[in-house]
Every structure is written in structure tokens, then in C-alpha cells.
Amino acid sequence: MRAFLGTVAFQGRVVIGEGEKDNAPMLFNGEEVGTGTGPECDIAVDPIDGTSLTAAGRQNALSVIAVSDRGSMLDASSVFYMDKLVTGPAGVGVVDIRLPIGENIRKLAGALGKPVDEIVVSVLNRPRHEQLIQEIRDAGAGTRLMSDGDVAGGINAARHAARTDMCVGVGGSPEGIVTACAIKALGGHIQGRLWPRDDDERQRGIDAGLDMDKVYEADDL
């Protein structure tokens, strides 16, 4: 990926990379890529979203790059994780990450014109999501638990032909930015809230100018 980006005629700057979080040697935050000519761009990269999936030869691992005009992409690199809510176009103006998950499921079911028990929600299978998964099931919806790959999970939730209707929960901030780009292209709904792991990370985000309490919409991301 790094070698390819070096051939592109643009002045690219990595806004969100994987370097610090995953101890990667390149494509780090702030790195300049491209030929140095052409438009100035922001870049978010996720060389492999779903490393374990790739190692096991399973589906839903992706290699992704998101590119936007310089200054338009949220630099959330100081906070590694983000809580996200993603749906297809039916969820636009209907669901809201600030609402209880059960209410969002019922609202989306109404917008889609199908019963709640036919709604399927994808969630990363992590201990931090145990209560969220139980609340989804208590609401009457089905769950699709992902071992990895929440970019694919978000994209599938926004695709008309996919078998999931919503993707929720805490995943990586880089994945959130990349997912937002895809969801905008698909006309779907995405909201995100930064999820600092401790007080030090929270303060690091505040020092970087991020709002820890803000709900970031697609255009913000």
C-alpha cells in the first residue's frame, strides 16, 4: 500500500494510520505520501481490517484507503476507539446513537417495513459488548457477532442486498473514518462517538481539539 500511494499524483497526508496502535513501521499519522504534485488530500488507511480473518483465510477482511480534500477528514488519531451506529439509507433521520438500542431497532424496523424479529444487528464479539448484545436480543432482534472486521460490518449494514440491517458498538477510530467514507457513498447513516479507554487518553483527545461528548455525523467524520 505504501509503495502504491507513492506513485499517485497527489500531495497526500496520512490523517489516520495504523502505526502507533499496531506498532506498524509506516503509514503513520502525519506521513506524506504521493508524488508531491496535484491536489492536497487527507488519507485514512487500514492496510488490513481483520488481521485474524486474513490469517485464518476467512471472509470480510478488507484492505482500505479513504481519501478526501485536505482538512475535511477528522483527525481522531489521539483516541484509538470509537462507538459507532451504522445503517442503510432507511435509517437516515430515523435512528440516533443517543437513543437506547432497543428504540433504534424498533424505529429502523418501522422504516424498513418489517417486524423487529427480522432485524439483524452486527456487533464485534468483544467482552465490552456483552450488555449491548443482550439488549439487542431483549429487543427481539437477531445478532451477527463478528470476530473482526468492523469496516465490512458497517458496509454490509448499509448495503441493500446484505443480510444485516445495523452495525453497532465500539471499534477502531481509523475504521470509523474509513467506514464513514463508504457509508456516505452508499447513502447510509453513520454516527460516531469517541471512546477513550482511560483518563489519559481522554485528555490526549481533548488536547488535540476533539470533543469527547460530541456525536460525530457523517460529514463531521
Where do the protein language model's features map onto the residues?
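Oxyanion/phosphate-interacting regions
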Residues: 156-221
